[in-house]
Amino acid sequence: MSWSPSLTTQTCGAWEMKERLGTGGFGNVIRWHNQETGEQIAIKQCRQELSPRNRERWCLEIQIMRRLTHPNVVAARDVPEGMQNLAPNDLPLLAMEYCQGGDLRKYLNQFENCCGLREGAILTLLSDIASALRYLHENRIIHRDLKPENIVLQQGEQRLIHKIIDLGYAKELDQGSLCTSFVGTLQYLAPELLEQQKYTVTVDYWSFGTLAFECITGFRPFLPNWQPVQWHSKVRQKSEVDIVVSEDLNGTVKFSSSLPYPNNLNSVLAERLEKWLQLMLMWHPRQRGTDPTYGPNGCFKALDDILNLKLVHILNMVTGTIHTYPVTEDESLQSLKARIQQDTGIPEEDQELLQEAGLALIPDKPATQCISDGKLNEGHTLDMDLVFLFDNSKITYETQISPRPQPESVSCILQEPKRNLAFFQLRKVWGQVWHSIQTLKEDCNRLQQGQRAAMMNLLRNNSCLSKMKNSMASMSQQLKAKLDFFKTSIQIDLEKYSEQTEFGITSDKLLLAWREMEQAVELCGRENEVKLLVERMMALQTDIVDLQRSPMGRKQGGTLDDLEEQARELYRRLREKPRDQRTEGDSQEMVRLLLQAIQSFEKKVRVIYTQLSKTVVCKQKALELLPKVEEVVSLMNEDEKTVVRLQEKRQKELWNLLKIACSKVRGPVSGSPDSMNASRLSQPGQLMSQPSTASNSLPEPAKKSEELVAEAHNLCTLLENAIQDTVREQDQSFTALDWSWLQTEEEEHSCLEQAS
């Protein structure tokens, strides 16, 4: 196996040597690929020049690696048969699992991470590395050299997994190795290691804190470009709570206990991790990692509390400000609204909380209903599930949104764009300018999401309104049909009643009741109300369609995307300059892009809020129409009940009339029904008794007529009996009905006699 810079391809059975993965002070790491199974492993071998002590510690490292089993520590593998024979020395090879994602340094060096990783990526990294360090410390192992180069990435089923490599057992820190080490790597070493003092597990706390700070901000916390000797003498002057020692563009060294901006953390995480970093970056090892709540070495438990936070992110659409709230599993939505009122001044009853799809939060569910697992997305999106806050007391939304404050160095070049800066200063400040333009674009996108959430909510309300409109129109048609039928029926009844009054039954009370029914149904129908509401809803529908057709109502890219891409390209070209061309330069071009981005942001925000105001007006109209439609539907329901009740009453009256009519035909009846009146019906036997007195004096034809009359008399008697039986049965079935509103039978007889 050759360790020269240009590797010659070697094979060992089915295994084929691939590229070099890394080169360290003690040897190289090479990727090997099994051509039959597709398996890949990383083989590490140390150089021959190791001292006897380091050779012994190297063998010890291999033994320890083989017994470690943890998802965040690179696992040892068996060295393929025959591969040890390819080694140029007698030191054993170390076979490890191969992680395809490369190391963390490569990840941090990506352009988009120049101002720190995304929030989701930071949280997963902190979780993984803390878990690995805990495991190592529980096994009485101190890493001592934790840095981005010693953390590799492996893509898991749901997210990236971070694994610690190079446990550092073969490293001997003497004065010579410190002087020849790369400047940057020494800053991850705890001060007591640099001072060659006794150390404990707290050396890993310092390294972890430095690593975490760099992942959050994009740069190391303490004078990253200084030489070791000057660095040590200056940084040791910091207070116990200082987590940043930086040099501004004027060369002034500043100490700070605050997490610097820009970074991609929300306000709650930034505050909590700032306090946690103060524990991890204490200069004195005995105090380092001591948490006020959990005591010595309590930093891991304190970090657990941070990682387990459940956060709700509320974007106040009135001000454009994001408010983040830690919530418990059982915290109610009402409790969250009370906290929102304290921060925003918007009363609870006026707060409307919408998710991105336009769905309102459900009052009976806990506040955690809008939280998803943000750790799974690795920060590739905006990293948070936003809930959009609207003030229902507002009819229109004014543009009150301003760009976020710029970092100090960016503000400096905005004032002096022609000022020449050193290359390392340009690299940092240009990265911050690009990040500022990215932030403007993301803030604009969030506001656009809020406007679209309001639009989606409007469409949901409009859909509900449309369904109610269709139901109202259908009910109106059905009611109209019933009313028309009833009016026609009552009109026919009145006409027929009028026709028979001369020879039939009359009742002023019945006539009055029918007239009152006719007047009562004239008040039913609600046709005018329905017509007016339909017209208003159609006008609203037109406004909503216009909103949807408007270019402002659709998600769009535009100038901010173009400016962000131009800034990225400028930054990329700066970083990729050859070392001999990394000279001083000004920032005029970057400043021009930033100023254009700010102008574009302000213009887009005005457009978004114009659209939002129109959306709110339409929603207000929809909300005003909903109860009116419900009221008309309710009134039509009552009208329908009224029509049914009147129809039932009318039917009962008709049956009562039939009863009265039947009671008048109990005696024999002669002649046609059309020729009978009440007085004649009252003397059914009178006609039949008259012909018998002169029957003997009649001629033969007259006798036959008399026989026919007698026969008719008998038939009338039979009919009278049948009618009486029928009336008796009807009397029994009608006894349960309330007939108090009609006249009694005696009153009816009296009226009939008077009429005759």
UniProtKB/Swiss-Prot annotation:
Changing K44A: Loss of kinase activity and no effect on binding to NIK. Does not phosphorylate STAT1 at 'Thr-749'. It is an enzyme of class 2 (transferase). Serine kinase that plays an essential role in the NF-kappa-B signaling pathway which is activated by multiple stimuli such as inflammatory cytokines, bacterial or viral products, DNA damages or other cellular stresses. Acts as a part of the canonical IKK complex in the conventional pathway of NF-kappa-B activation. Phosphorylates inhibitors of NF-kappa-B on 2 critical serine residues. These modifications allow polyubiquitination of the inhibitors and subsequent degradation by the proteasome. The modification Hydroxyproline is found at P191. Residues 737-742 are annotated as: NEMO-binding. GO terms for molecular function: ATP binding; identical protein binding; IkappaB kinase activity; protein heterodimerization activity; protein homodimerization activity; protein kinase activity; protein kinase binding; protein serine kinase activity. Highly expressed in heart, placenta, skeletal muscle, kidney, pancreas, spleen, thymus, prostate, testis and peripheral blood. This is Inhibitor of nuclear factor kappa-B kinase subunit beta. Its EC number is 2.7.11.10, 2.7.11.1. Changing D166A: Loss of protein kinase activity. The kinase domain is located in the N-terminal region. The leucine zipper is important to allow homo- and hetero-dimerization. At the C-terminal region is located the region responsible for the interaction with NEMO/IKBKG. InterPro entries: IKBKB_SDD, IKBKB_SDD_sf, IKK, IKKbetaNEMObind, Kinase-like_dom_sf, Prot_kinase_dom, Ser/Thr_kinase_AS, Ubiquitin-like_dom. Keywords: Acetylation, ATP-binding, Cytoplasm, Disease variant, Host-virus interaction, Hydroxylation, Isopeptide bond, Kinase, Membrane, Nucleotide-binding, Nucleus, Phosphoprotein, S-nitrosylation, SCID, Serine/threonine-protein kinase, Transferase, Ubl conjugation. The active site is at D145.
